[in-house]
Amino acid sequence: TGGDPLVLSPRRLREITERLAAIVHVQVVRFHTRVPVVEPGRVDAPMIAALRASGKATYLAVHANHPREFSPEASEAIARLVDGGVVLVSQSVLLRGVNDDVETLAALMKLFVQHRIKPYYLHHPDLAPGTSHFRLSIEKGQALVAGLRGRISGLAQPTYVLDLPGGHGKVPIAAAAIANGDGCWNIRDWQGQTHRYPPEDGT
């Protein structure tokens, strides 16, 4: 559904980032890419220097959807980026038949963290033409994300979001963990059990 800025030459990428440097109110620059996992050889010193040429805080969102995408070459490319001073976050799409089970998602998020990539967004599939076979229900997505809470640390948890059609932005859609009642809160844990807070006995 979009282009990839890292398919540009380092020269062209530097031209863009240097122009961003001149915009005073822009303090943070973020790029999104799949290049580190699909064409890791492109990630070299000139590209990394071009990414950082703005002199501003630079973040790179690495798009990956399955643990198998982390080839040795991809791992090396990611390490070059991090060691070169680029902060990495992740973006993944929840896809039926690809990563729609807790084990695969947990393994993917762990790999992100092991590669020094902070899990960021887990997208519900867009309504893009020709992709209906990848879509699953929001209810299933919510259940999968709830299942992650019992398997991986907080550092590895992504934010499950829906990008609303019509340009209305991204909205977190994980199932609500809390509900208010009688001045107390009923809080649901990762196993689906509900706990009263504060407890009735005050402990």
Each model region followed by its residue ranges:
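Conserved AdoMet/S-adenosylmethionine-binding subsite of the radical SAM
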Residues: 3-152
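Auxiliary Fe-S-binding modules of radical SAM enzymes
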Residues: 113-203
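Extended hydrophobic secondary-structure segments that form protein cores and membrane-embedded regions
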Residues: 1, 61, 161-163
